Amino acid sequence: MIKYALVGDVGGTNARLALCDIASGEISQAKTYSGLDYPSLEAVIRVYLEEHKVEVKDGCIAIACPITGDWVAMTNHTWAFSIAEMKKNLGFSHLEIINDFTAVSMAIPMLKKEHLIQFGGAEPVEGKPIAVYGAGTGLGVAHLVHVDKRWVSLPGEGGHVDFAPNSEEEAIILEILRAEIGHVSAERVLSGPGLVNLYRAIVKADNRLPENLKPKDITERALADSCTDCRRALSLFCVIMGRFGGNLALNLGTFGGVFIAGGIVPRFLEFFKASGFRAAFEDKGRFKEYVHDIPVYLIVHDNPGLLGSGAHLRQTLGHIL
């Protein structure tokens, strides 16, 4: 008989839940719920388990916020809870709550070739560190290392490091944004809102008034080639993505690969392929040769958060990935 665990990927808007075959790691019965419709994460879990008529005793939920102890308060949602209390209330034997990019990083060992698109570099070196980052509502970052037959995810808040410009245009962008918001983190330019910031700064640098555009508007106009400012913003976004990825590669010597997750880049894949991304990734001065062979991959799996939550839980329960 198949033994299932509950896995989840919870953001500021939606909660996506599924079942994970503990033996194989296969994900099934995925369903998305609007977080606005439920008073708590526990309530959503109860509805899911009732709808699917399944009893589970183990679970792992990935959440888009820092996890530093038993009390979890979501960054972009009103939900807050005690992990120990929810585990007890649900009657679980084991409940893990992890950061969303911890989950994405743990998905990487489970991905197949068809789940990845490579952007330059050579083959990954087995056993070497891995970096993963992705732009969405914010900028998520994690690293992954292999130690004693176990994968260890190194989460953090790397999206909030300083934005480090390396061209005259980028320096002007920094100056304009710093005057508006003070500290300018990488997330302020590498995210959905960050794309808007880039567009606004480009227009303001020319002493013009920017339109009130959303990230989707900027992307659509750039791809249609109907707005020079939007196209410049999207091009610059790709370049800064490259610079940031190259920095991650240098930090930990990620010869196991640098992986891009998140929902933004797949929306303009062909544009991204033709952009200055890879050149910027390798633009490291004296260390250009060092990063030259490090491969970069775009993750195109539908649910890396669910896959990684399952992988994390299975490893915690003693399985070798």
Curated annotation (Swiss-Prot):
GO terms for molecular function: ATP binding; D-glucose binding; glucokinase activity. The keyword Signal does not apply. SUPFAM superfamilies: Actin-like ATPase domain. It comes from the Bacteria. One of its GO terms (cellular component) is cytosol. It is an enzyme of class 2 (transferase). Belongs to the bacterial glucokinase family. This is Glucokinase.
